[in-house]
């Protein structure tokens, strides 16, 4: 009757589990977000005892240690105990996470080389120093509110699956061949689906979508032909990471807004998402030229001179409409008076840039994954904001 594309093999099971989780929360008087995107009064979680919370935190840490030690063992042939010992000693000295120890190849580096890396603990410093407004952060965790707030930059039809009639759905997507469903508070591409639309299947698709957890349904972006060379199935995106303030300079030379860096993310064959954590790849972008400044890298930290599926050479590839995308981010910060340490995800369509998402925790792995094999971190790039 109709075709849902690129669904994870366990999608139906995961969807059922997600719905059960929502029902369970609601029975306890809890809800993730109210209509204005803020936690409802009953949703406030009672703090667990210190011992219980510490035990959960320690269990999660040990799981991350085991997983990443095993990944290193497969790569190096080292034994478990010595690898774990080296990891824990480095974590104690630097404050890195087990995943950073693996991804940035800290097990191969001297202490001096390790100290060149911008690691997760510095993100917490930025979040504290630049203090993104809590109301703005709550907005970013609600895709409906984000799309409304930055409407002039979204530039594509969209709706909320639980708040649209069939007639409105048809009118919104009358000229659309495919749509994307995204959970309202989803992240890292989890739960995203691409769906073909035809006049004959419109009602069936609508009836199916309204049973999903609340989310946004957007017209699938027809990306620029040049971006398709990186991956034709995923919507490949630029990320700009910015620092901005309305009251104090964010750089030593007095700038109130600055773009720290940009990366591009692109998917693998058959995937509709480009996130590094969902199997995609990443490369750094030269902020002046819009050309890729590094080879590509995957979530294992392996480098690719050419894309393994399309064969295109990655380093030197020029992003179309890069200048327009960069200026769009600056304009959004200025017109919405955005403050804080923010990541902006931009797609490049045939007609120019479109805003995908805005993030208050843009991460550090995308910036340093590709340069990792050169044993040179990017802390030097971020020090002026510290």
What are these regions (language model features)?
Residues 167, 188-191, 249, 270-271, ...:
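Short catalytic/ligand-binding loop motif for oxyanion handling, primarily in non-cytosolic enzymes
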Residues 129-238, 243:
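Active-site nucleotide/adenylate-binding loops and adjacent lid/helix of ATP-dependent enzymes
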Residues 179, 258-260, 354-356:
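Protein kinase-like catalytic core scaffold
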Residues 52-172, 329:
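Conserved N-proximal alpha/beta basic substrate-recognition cap immediately N-terminal to
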Residues 288-308:
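A glycine-rich, aromatic-flanked flexible loop/lid motif
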Residues 45, 57, 302-330, 334-341, ...:
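C-terminal active-site "lid" helix and adjoining low-complexity regulatory extension at the edge
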